[in-house]
Regions:
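AAA+ P-loop NTPase catalytic core and its hallmark functional loops
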Residues: 8-241, 258-266, 270
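Extended, composition-driven regions rather than compact fold-specific motifs
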Residues: 251-255
């Protein structure tokens, strides 16, 4: 069964699907983000391969990560994207490989999601593959990656740097065409990443609130109450550290006055 599973991953049946086009222009229409920041972040991801988007709650880190990947791929191709969220109980078994119970409680060997996408990328070297890890700082990152942790480094990529995994005894390496983007809130100091080994393997890019973005100004200026609330939030942010600032994404969707009041009362006020 293990052999058949490997063969299916390395030699998948070709499926022809339509993927919606997505480029830089569309990104900048959908995301309140400056063009120079887009160019900088895109270049950082492609050059360094491992990037963590950090920032206060509500700045749109996950939203930005997903759409940045779309724009790099040139289309909304979910087949080349792994999205996962880390948490305290997330394990190496789920991420890399291990024995897990099936529907009737029998433990069977299963490949984890990261190992599967690495196998896909290895079999398709002309295309880029992306791993988006939401709340990356909420999991025990070194344990989740396990033996593969060192292999995500730029100079440790490729088949020449393979390791033998303890569980399956299979040879494993992280292909050159796999890119890892993590997101993390800087709001909770208890979850701050202080592990030097981790910081050495990732670049950290800070996402700031976009209240000064011209497109966002045009959006909120259409509603007098929203304009008043945004102005108040901007003033509050001046007295807050970068880690505690209130993000703009609370106000990005169309809202009537009642929605705005509820957002302020139940989402914004608890933060301050």
């Amino acid at each position: 069964e293990v052999i058949y599973s490997m063969m299916r991953e390395l030699n998948p049946k070709k499926q022809y699907r339509y993927y919606e086009d997505y480029d830089k222009e569309r990104f900048l229409k959908e995301v309140y983000f400056e063009e120079k920041d887009y160019d900088e972040l895109r270049s950082l991801i492609l050059r360094r391969k491992n990037v963590i988007l950090q920032g206060a709650p509500g700045v749109g880190k996950t939203y930005i990560a997903k759409r940045m990947v779309y724009s790099i791929l040139g289309r909304k191709d979910e087949e080349k994207i792994l999205s996962v969220q880390f948490h305290e109980l997330y394990s190496n078994d789920e991420f890399m490989e291990g024995y897990r119970p099936d529907d009737i409680g029998i433990y069977k060997y299963k490949r984890g999601c990261f190992k599967r996408i690495c196998n896909k990328a290895r079999n398709d070297p002309s295309n880029k593959y992306f791993v988006i890890i939401d709340e990356i700082n909420r999991g025990n990152i070194t344990k989740i990656f396990g033996e593969a942790f060192s292999l995500i480094e730029i100079d440790k990529r490729g088949k020449d740097n393979y390791i033998e995994l303890a569980c399956s005894r299979e040879r494993f390496y992280v292909p050159e065409n796999v890119y890892i983007i993590g997101t993390m809130n800087t709001f909770d100091e208890k979850l701050a990443i202080k592990d030097y080994a981790l910081r050495r393997r990732f670049c950290f890019y800070t996402i700031n609130p976009a209240f000064e973005n011209e497109d966002f100004k045009k959006f909120y200026s259409q509603n007098p109450l929203l304009s008043k609330v945004v102005s108040a939030v901007v003033n509050v942010n001046k007295d807050l550290s970068d880690d505690l600032k209130i993000g703009h994404s609370y106000f990005c969707k169309p809202m009537d006055d009642e929605d705005i009041k509820m957002t302020v009362k139940y989402s914004i006020e608890p933060l301050v």
